[in-house]
């Protein structure tokens, strides 16, 4: 009997020490009730609180990466090497099947026609595209066309800044799974499902809010830099 008490006491002390070393939170599992039978006891998950902040930061980093790429793509505006890809030629072929387009610096496009016999058809397709672009023959290569791009106007710059702002709002707060607001709300739902509502939970919630605020600031800073670039500042 003495040995049994000693064993129980030792086990209890070890369990208590483990809890002090690694703080945990409790999360309810849904109870199950069989037909005509008693309700089963609720099971409890032991959750390490740090996983919520880790999850938040990981998803925020991914969103920030996507946001940065979308801002960059949007900032290019009409300077897009794929601008002609879906144009149709007189013979019914698609532009991208007959030629390729690359950026040549910031002020022009370079079109390389695969078959020199199709150069006239390519020129006609570009002129008919309604984009107000005029291809010029490259003197040193009869299969290449240089297309000067018109300089952006004050109006076009302002419109592009509005588009950048739309991208910012999408990643700041929208139903998109990649928006910071959506990710934050999902993590908060998980925190609210915890059974243990004490100071440890409050601290985690405060940390989540701080991290969210920091990442919104990062979005805002990238937007300001993109707007300055567009406005030529």
Curated annotation (Swiss-Prot):
Belongs to the RRF family. It is found in: Mitochondrion. Keywords: Mitochondrion, Protein biosynthesis, Transit peptide. One of its GO terms (biological process) is mitochondrial translation. Necessary for protein synthesis in mitochondria. Functions as a ribosome recycling factor in mitochondria. This is Ribosome-recycling factor, mitochondrial. Gene3D superfamilies: 3.30.1360.40, Ribosome-recycling factor. The gene is RRF1. InterPro entries: Ribosome_recyc_fac (IPR002661), Ribosome_recyc_fac_dom (IPR023584), RRF_sf (IPR036191). Its main location: mitochondrion. GO terms for molecular function: ribosomal large subunit binding. PANTHER family: MITOCHONDRIAL RIBOSOME RECYCLING FACTOR PSEUDO 1, RIBOSOME RECYCLING FACTOR. It comes from the Eukaryota. The lineage of its organism: Eukaryota, Fungi, Dikarya, Ascomycota, Saccharomycotina.
């Amino acid at each position: 009997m003495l040995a049994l008490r000693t064993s129980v006491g030792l086990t209890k002390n070890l369990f208590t020490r483990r809890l002090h070393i690694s703080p945990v939170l409790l999360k309810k599992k849904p109870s199950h009730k069989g037909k005509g039978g008693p309700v089963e006891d609720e099971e409890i998950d032991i959750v390490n609180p740090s996983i919520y902040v880790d999850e938040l930061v990981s998803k925020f980093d991914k969103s920030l990466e996507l946001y940065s790429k979308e801002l960059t793509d949007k900032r290019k505006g009409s300077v897009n090497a794929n601008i002609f890809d879906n144009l149709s030629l007189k013979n019914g072929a698609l532009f991208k099947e007959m030629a390729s387009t690359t950026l040549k610096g910031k002020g022009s496009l370079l079109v390389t026609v695969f078959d020199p016999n199709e150069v006239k058809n390519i020129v006609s397709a570009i002129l008919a595209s309604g984009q107000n672009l005029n291809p010029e023959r490259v003197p040193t290569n009869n299969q290449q066309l240089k297309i000067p791009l018109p300089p952006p106007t004050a109006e076009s710059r302002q419109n592009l800044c509005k588009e950048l702002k739309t991208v910012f709002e999408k990643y700041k707060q929208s139903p998109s799974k990649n928006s910071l607001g959506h990710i934050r709300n999902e993590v908060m739902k998980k925190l609210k499902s915890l059974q243990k509502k004490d100071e440890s939970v409050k601290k985690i919630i405060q940390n989540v809010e701080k991290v969210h605020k920091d990442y919104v600031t990062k979005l805002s800073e990238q937007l300001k830099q993109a707007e300055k670039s567009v406005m030529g500042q």
